[in-house]
Regions:
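ATPase catalytic-site recognition across NTP-hydrolyzing enzymes
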Residues: 1-42
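Proline-rich low-complexity regions
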Residues: 21, 179-180
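Acidic, glycine-rich loop-and-beta core segments that form the ion-binding/anion-interacting portion
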Residues: 31-65
């Protein structure tokens, strides 16, 4: 599909090196009852963006319903934004495990914030497992057809998906198993 969009339809873009190609921008239901499960993901940031995604799961597909994407804000400033934007406090919010104090602040505010368990593995192996899951690679022997649907209002998520690529070896021109 990416090659057709670029070479067939004449759209701008680069096919090579994209980490995820199984996503599309689409108007999707914002009714949480339309999904089998709802989760919230949060990647803490300050200089880099603090990103919160409201996700729906249905039939093995991921639906990115809403995003909060802010820079240079303390947790105490972000919590009211999440409440104002209707992020459901009673759904599990999976958070970056490196920031237990921030998780505690969310819990104190009434959110079901939990640290993501990175198990006892290297950061690279953990990241690789996350990418495999997003692609639909459940195990070495089981792959499912998974599509990630992104609501058009999630402009920062769309931008990140368009820019998330594998590192390219400058000498050989080959892509490495290392996200950038």
């Amino acid at each position: 599909p990416e090659g057709y969009q670029i070479y067939g339809l004449g759209e701008w873009g680069e096919v090579g090196g994209l980490i995820l190609k199984n996503w599309t921008v689409q108007n999707i239901s914002q009714n949480l009852d339309d999904y089998d499960d709802i989760a919230i993901g949060q990647d803490f940031g300050f200089n880099h963006a603090n990103a919160i995604l409201l996700l729906g799961i249905k039939d093995d597909n991921i639906y990115i319903l809403q995003e909060i994407y802010v820079f240079e804000k303390e947790t105490a400033e972000i919590i009211p934004l999440a409440i104002q934007d209707g992020i459901p406090a009673k759904r599990t919010m999976w958070c970056d495990s490196a920031e237990p104090d921030r998780i505690k602040a969310w819990r104190t505010a009434g959110f079901r914030a939990r640290a993501v368990s990175k198990e006892h593995t290297t950061e690279k192996k953990y990241q690789s497992a996350q990418i495999d899951w997003l692609k639909g690679i459940v195990s070495k022997d089981r792959v499912i057809h998974r599509t990630i649907y992104v609501h058009p209002s999630c402009v920062n998520t769309i931008k990140e998906l368009q820019q998330w690529k594998w590192k390219k070896d400058e000498r050989t021109g080959e892509y490495l198993d290392e996200p950038v």
